[in-house]
């Protein structure tokens, strides 16, 4: 069952939001992610909903490399909103950097370690001495993957060539290029952090038999090194063709804005998240989402925008 759908069906946006056109921005932009991934799907749905319900005159989603790029787009002013992993959003800010704030936790990201089923790799330890796609530069995956490999006690080498001592050869490829390389045999594994199922992985599974590695044993070390922003989550059986249920590491996805975004836009967007959650869940999703009143405010230590906090208090007491 998709979280938030019951709420969305039972409640419509307050007439004050729908009727309020004065003072709304002409355009809003939502920094998303790579084609074939949940970030861009979610951002496109959010942009359409923002426009449909009059939060802005128009709204559009931006294709980006992922979380780190999105935060940079936000700070530069090129994006109004950004979707980002909690671990990326929670990194220490450089002195003088534009502050970001959360509007809410929107859904769970699942770290996928994808291998070919005939590779003989059945555990993360089997990646030693292999070529591994660790995420596109600017993506949240490119931040999370080195943390996972370090937690597993695996060392890496740059330049795409495995080291003599079993070092993993790091290849900076994102989702689509990484899947192409996996099919071609030029990488042995692909890391990707996204929703379940990720459409591009589903499509790739039609052409080659895939497997996912269990990463849940790394959780305690990850938390010891980086805090409690990581979770143990289950990729359900049937999420991908022929892939059984597998435990992995998850992290929350947050909807972010600049801390100086005007209160009216923030409040109207929060109302949309609460009252129209059903419009924001991709069709391909299994519904393992955070778009519910109980979880929206749990932003993994990233502060809520003051207007968002006020809106949640008004909506839920």
Residue ranges and their predicted role:
Residues 48-55, 75-79, 150-154, 183-187, ...:
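Sec-exported extracytoplasmic/periplasmic mature domains
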Residues 86-89, 95, 119, 157-255, ...:
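Pocket-lining segment of extracytoplasmic ligand-binding domains
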